[in-house]
Amino acid sequence: IHIIVFFETKIPEYRQDEVYKLTIKINQLIWLGHFDIWSDELMPVFRYNLLLSGGLIPTDIQFNSLLRHITDTCEKFFPSFQYVIWGGNNADEAIKNSIFTTAGES
């Protein structure tokens, strides 16, 4: 199974280097799947592969967990790409803004 999630935002040429730095930093933080830049369109993507050999089929629980992981990871780091592409922030600032955790309740 190969799943690709496209972030429908084109990376301007003047932000490409910083987006590549961000992609490397994010990939160092995650264990499953990876972010990449779709070279034809210059768009950030998240890619996930699941190798199933010998006719194996994932259970509903496994597939739902896979989709939840993909969704959670994309939702967590999509703002980082926005901070860099449109906000003009550097990769370090963007990561800090995306991985903070809140304390307490409102």
Labelled PLM ranges:
Residues F35-G88:
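Charged, low-complexity intrinsically disordered regions
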Residues I1-I4, K10-I11, S106:
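N-terminal accessory segment detector
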Residues F6-M43:
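Short, internal acidic amphipathic alpha-helical interface segments
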Residues I4-F6, R15-E18, L50, P58-I61:
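Surface-exposed beta-strand edges and their flanking turn/coil or helix-capping segments
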Residues Q16, F78, A91-D92:
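Alpha-helix initiation and N-capping motif
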